[in-house]
Structure formats: C-alpha cells, structure tokens
C-alpha cells in the first residue's frame, strides 16, 4: 500500500561572517585551545554581528534551501522554525521569516526544544504533510546563542555558536516500504522534565523579566546523553526493521565530539559514516543538524537515495531521532 512521505527537496544554511577561534577565547578567559579541543572537538565558531538576529540567519538559510530545491517561496504553505533564541517573546520569529520570504499565506510558527529542536520540528512538519493539511514545508533551525551566553563562564561560552540551516519538504506518494521509500521514514521524540535544571537559561520575560544566561551541569548532561540518544535510535530501528548497517550517513546533533563518538561506537556505526561539523561550527543548538546536512550535501557525500540517521538531545531533557531517505 502506498504512503505519503515528506520528501526532502533541498537544504541550505547560513553562518555569520565573524569567526571566533579557541585562541581568541583563550585571550579573554582562563582556557586554551588544547583544553577545548580535547574535551569538545571544537576549534572555532561563528558569532552573529550586532543587529544580526535569528530571523536574519533563518531567512538566508531558507533562501538557500529554496534555491537548492528549485522551488519558489510562494509554493511554501508551512514554516516550522526551531529556535531557543527568538527575535522577540512574540510574535513568532517564523512569521518574520515568512514575511522576509515574501509569503503571506499558509502557517508559520516557532517550536522550542532547545538542541533537539530541529528533530522535533521535522517530526511536526512531517505529520502535518502526511495528513494532507499542507503540501510543502520549510523546516528551519536557527540560533543566536551568543546572546544568552555568560562570556565569563569558560564551561559554556566555549561550546556554542550561531547559525541556521533549513530543509524543504514536500508531501509525495511513495511505495510504502521503509526499506526503499524516499522522505522521512520515521521519527521518535522524548522528553523528561525531571532534568530541566541540568541545562537551562536562568531568566525569562514572564518570571524574572530578564533574558538570563545559559547554565549547564556539563557532567550530568554527558552522563545521560549517550544512553538517551542510543535508546531513541534503537526505537527508530525497531519501528522500521532497519539497523546500523542500513544507514549511509549518521548526522547527529553537533554538541561534543566525545558524545558523538561514544554514541556511534555504542550503535556500531562506522566512523566514516559520521558527519562531523562541531569542529568548525561549535554547538549551534537547533541549527546544528541542518547545518551538517547542508555541508554533507554540498561536498557530495549525501546523495539521492541515501538513508540518513538524525539524532539530538537538548535541555529539558528532550531527545529524538529520525530516519530520512534523501
């Protein structure tokens, strides 16, 4: 029996021009390039310019994705934007993106699941498309985490960067086989609020009337990450009858190279199948997966028909996985 799948038509990304290296950070705070690389794998990150907002990054990534897909912005009837750093409390940054693209129809809204945001947004758009409510969607992850960092906290300020990535999805009829269908094959989302104090921002417009800064218990996050990530990936494999040998590329959330390496090892995924961009992007939260997809697509690694495994974990905790055939 045939199925409607959300097929990826194209992807795109945008990174701010300013690059901050580990050496530049070491000149400001008590850290070193060796310390950062050894613990995280990060060597540099991009930082948004003054006056450059999350919506600006998202619009540029969306435009690149539309160009890659070969479709007009007016054909988009759904925009789902994953971000933890919106331009304003309201309206949604997605409507600013919609307006910036010259679209005044359909629906646009933000989704917040921190670093898991893109996987959550992908799953949300996929469900809308498969029901027939919408035909063609932009799924965007965009962040300006530099605005919520405590630049005196060496445990967090060295980790994050700014950027945006996007994919264009279209509802298409497929044969109905997880083994061959193009598009989003399966998604699995999880949350557990018992861990909300382990990674959070210590402020909020409705509680403290402040923006606040990112706070993290790094060891606690690391301790939970690998187990949660692998469990939700196993869920994806069990739901489809696929396995680690089936996938062509593993595109994880780019938080920390040690977490990525440990997850791939536990799942028996060969290192050469892992797409890594954390060294040059840092942790861009909801933007990291679409940024990595765009890199691997542009350099020719990801090709039509490839099966891609996505995973992410973020504050909350939230975590999720997706299997997508390009």
Swiss-Prot record:
GO terms for molecular function: 3-oxoacyl-[acyl-carrier-protein] synthase activity; beta-ketoacyl-acyl-carrier-protein synthase III activity. It is found in: Cytoplasm. GO terms for cellular component: cytoplasm. InterPro entries: ACP_syn_III_C (IPR013747), ACP_syn_III_N (IPR013751), FabH (IPR004655), Thiolase-like (IPR016039). One of its GO terms (biological process) is fatty acid biosynthetic process. Pfam families: ACP_syn_III, ACP_syn_III_C. Its EC number is 2.3.1.180. It comes from the Bacteria. Homodimer. This is Beta-ketoacyl-[acyl-carrier-protein] synthase III. The lineage of its organism: Bacteria, Pseudomonadati, Pseudomonadota, Alphaproteobacteria, Hyphomicrobiales. The gene is fabH.
């Amino acid at each position: 029996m045939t199925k409607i799948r959300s097929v990826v038509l194209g992807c795109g990304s945008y990174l701010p021009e300013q690059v901050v290296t580990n050496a530049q950070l070491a000149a400001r705070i008590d850290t070193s390039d060796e310390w950062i690389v050894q613990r995280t794998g990060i060597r540099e990150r991009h930082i948004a310019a003054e006056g450059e907002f999350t919506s600006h990054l998202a619009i540029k990534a969306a435009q690149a994705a539309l160009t890659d897909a070969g479709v007009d912005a007016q054909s988009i009837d759904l925009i789902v934007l994953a971000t933890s750093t919106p331009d304003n409390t309201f309206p949604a940054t997605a409507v600013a993106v919609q307006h910036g693209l010259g679209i005044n129809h359909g629906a646009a809204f933000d989704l917040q699941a921190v670093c898991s945001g893109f996987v959550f947004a992908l799953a949300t758009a996929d469900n809308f498309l498969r029901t027939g409510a919408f035909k063609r969607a932009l799924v965007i992850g965009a962040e300006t985490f530099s605005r919520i960092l405590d630049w005196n906290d060496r445990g967090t300020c060295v980790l994050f960067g700014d950027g945006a990535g996007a994919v264009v999805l279209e509802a298409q009829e497929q044969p109905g086989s997880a083994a061959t269908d193009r598009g989003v094959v399966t998604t699995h989302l999880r949350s557990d609020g018992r861990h909300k104090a382990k990674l959070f921002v210590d402020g909020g417009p409705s509680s403290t009337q402040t923006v606040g800064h990112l706070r993290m218990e790094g060891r606690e996050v690391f301790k939970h990450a690998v187990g949660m990530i692998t469990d939700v990936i196993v869920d994806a494999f069990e739901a489809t009858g696929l396995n680690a040998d089936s996938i062509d590329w593993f595109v994880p959330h780019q938080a920390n190279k040690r977490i990525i390496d440990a997850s791939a090892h536990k799942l028996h995924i060969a290192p050469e199948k892992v797409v890594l961009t954390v060294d040059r992007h840092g942790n861009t939260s909801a933007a990291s997966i679409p940024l990595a997809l765009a890199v691997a697509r542009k350099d020719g690694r990801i090709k039509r028909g490839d099966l891609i495994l996505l995973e992410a974990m973020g504050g909350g905790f939230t975590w999720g996985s997706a299997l997508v055939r390009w």
